[in-house]
Amino acid sequence: MIDAIYNGGLNLVAASWWTGAAWPVIWNLIKIICVVLPLLGAVAYLTLWERKLLGFMQVRFGPNRVGPFGLLQPIADALKLLTKELIQPAAAAKGLFYLGPVMAIMPALGAWAVIPFGPDLALANVNAGLLLVMAITSIEVYGVIIAGWASNSKYAFLGALRASAQMVSYEIAMGFCFLVVIMVSGSMNLTEIVAVQGRGTMTDMGLGFLSWNWLPLFPIFIVYLISVVAEVNRHPFDVVEGEAEIVAGHMVEYSGMGFAIFFLAEYASMWLVSILAVVMFLGGWLPPFDALGFIPGWIWLGIKTFLVVSMFIWIRATFPRFRYDQIMRLGWKIFIPVTLVWLLVVGAWLLSPWNIWK
């Protein structure tokens, strides 16, 4: 369908040579807009869903004043932040102070270029998609470091130091999780990783969800879920912005749209790591049962991603914040050894007669 639309548009503008030559660029811009605009809307309404779900878990109503059922609350919040003054600290490094939020939001949005929403539905279907996601998202920590240093505030700098140490530490465990998935899939292409999960005895029996990677790679699945919570600095790993000690961490000196961009980066990263979990471990757009195959794949992808994102909020409502030394110990002394052992286990499993990924 996507190819048909592209070819139709190409034929439509072919009459003018310069428009025809520019059509691939125009087409890519259209695809980028079709990904980014819904993503920004999803980020905005994720804030509302978080507040509503936390309210339900804490036996209160949550936002319910702006619009019917509070549905216009994200728009009101966006307008409020847009109209607030962007205050720059007197001793801040001006250029770097404004570069920090940009460095944080760009990787969170840029990594979506290789995320597939269906078998033939991706902005860029590249063979090294998983590697590209890892490379792009690792840049986000530089935005945090720059923001903390450029603010010329001890609280912001301390938050940036914590963030950089925590994100780098858990990136190692997360990278090993990626390696295990690459080993069993035989590819770094995200579309192929989903396709591999659609094969097997259980899929032939109509129980496709038992062929997904979450079951044979369950320890890796759990390590990945916990690692990405730490990677995006979400509760209970949010010592980076621990309200009781360093207020908002690296964002403490930001106001208005500067603060809003950091906020957008955090929630866009939540959607990103959630859809990656679905693609790598939960079958992507594949239905759990063959009987439900009539439902479009992008709907299944959306449902699964929404459930994983809701898990982030559930964790926030359930667990107390960990101490910083506990977070570092978990990453270095538990997760990295566990993932290394599982790399060896899966390697031996793939070479054994009981290889289920053939």
From Swiss-Prot:
PROSITE patterns: COMPLEX1_ND1_1, COMPLEX1_ND1_2. It is found in: Cell inner membrane. Its EC number is 7.1.1.-. Keywords: Cell inner membrane, Cell membrane, Membrane, NAD, Quinone, Translocase, Transmembrane, Transmembrane helix, Ubiquinone. Pfam families: NADHdh (PF00146). The chain crosses the membrane at residues 29-49, 95-115, 130-150, 176-196, 206-226, 258-280, 297-317, 334-354. It is a multi-pass membrane protein. It comes from the Bacteria. Its main location: membrane. One of its GO terms (biological process) is aerobic respiration. One of its GO terms (molecular function) is oxidoreductase activity, acting on NAD(P)H, quinone or similar compound as acceptor. It catalyses: a quinone + NADH + 5 H(+)(in) = a quinol + NAD(+) + 4 H(+)(out). NDH-1 is composed of 14 different subunits. Subunits NuoA, H, J, K, L, M, N constitute the membrane sector of the complex. This is NADH-quinone oxidoreductase subunit H. It comes from Acidovorax sp. (strain JS42). The gene is nuoH.
